[in-house]
Amino acid sequence: MPLRSAPLPRMAGHLSFMRSQSKEICDVKSGDLVVIGLPFEDTNAPHAGQSLASRALRETSVYFGWHANPQFSHPVDIDARQDIQTDGLHERLCDLGDISLGPDEAIQATLKAAISQISRNGACAIILGGSDSLSETVQSAMPKCQTAQLGGIPRDARDFHVAPLPNGCATTCKLETAAQLARLSQWRDASKPLFVRFDLSVFETSLSALCDQPRLGGCDLDTVVQWLELLGQHEVNAIMLTGLNPSRPGMGVVKVGQRLMVTALLAFIYARLRFGIDHLGCLTSKEEVST
């Protein structure tokens, strides 16, 4: 089913992520979570439609704005709902809208300036996209940043990889929970900015129906949620969502890939804002980590 051209009934009016407030970048404060959209295509992608990802994720997020709409807290699994206090979410979550279309150089310059300013202000950028073609631009806005990548193709051996797509280069091994957590703690340098790339391909094949790069194996939803919750407890400067192509056939009006990404992203948001988080989360299953 193609992405609806008109908003769903609950989305009348201005469409923002989880119905968050709109802000100008000059009004971003320390501790804010700042949503920004990248409605662009990867020219090397096998299918067109990645530019629709930012809108699709915003549409889906409306159903997760349970601080305003408690009956729609978790459309994937109602049992996954956590009873936590989210006082202050509306004040700290904001949406800047999308980067405007234009020449590649102008897009990259605008994005780099925006991410750099958000990071300098002590806020965290949530970048909604389908294409990962601008991920290097995001990295360049945060000099000497470390990158943690969930899914996707490994590009740098120095990055921390969770369930990467096989490319014939990375060495992938099975590690127990304690070793995984120890490796993340050893890898993380708190003096450097932290960039998280969250690609839809991190999910197991049966779940990633809207992904242009299907894969064998992968994580279930609970495991991805736990990883993002764990990463969110670090001072992440930016997280970028990639790999989503809403034009591919999916399941239902609010498609499965969109629901998975927003469900998992909520764990990151709550952890980053320190909502109901008293200690580091622990993973309960084995997972693939590239070393």
Walk through the language-model features, giving the residues of each:
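A domain-level signal for caspase-like cysteine endopeptidase catalytic cores
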Residues: 160-167
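Short His-Asn-centered micro-motif
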Residues: 128-130, 150-151
